[in-house]
Amino acid sequence: IVSERYTPYLTTKHPAEILTIANHILGTGQLSLAKFVFITADDTNQLSTHHVQEYFEYILSRLDLGNDIHFYTKTTMDTLDYSGEGLNAGSKVVIAAYGDVKRNLATTVPTRLLDLNMDASLVMPGVIAVNAATYTTAALQNALIGQGEALLEQEGVVMMIRTEDPKWMASALNNFLSAAFTRT
């Protein structure tokens, strides 16, 4: 959680200084090994990273999926990424969300997903886990063609994760964090 001070006179809030700080994090010592950076600013100073679910909800409710996700691919910064094409050719992602609330997050699995006979569980507001055994990535994409914007804007689903066991992932926040962010 940082301060956003580059353009305090603008009425529209968007990440600016936040991105500078995220790049600083990715370029500093052991921090450069980070695979995911979730970063935001809180003008009220009420938000805390010690309250992980609240922090995620804050970011997910403000996230502009078209502008706030920044990928670094084939970067030499990441020597611990074994999914790359070679040594020191990994990837990272910065999710930098700031500004006014853009959506209310889903607090139940949306009916449109249940109607598709998905084995899905609500992990936390805005995050749904889907059983990988019942839907391949391609099948999931085909089933949801044309529904992505509605799931996001009307239903408040920001993140869907395919997993072997959606109920396990949803049973504890640490299960979600471990499976989603340390195994990719």
Predicted regions, residues:
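Charged, compositionally biased interaction regions
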Residues: 1-184
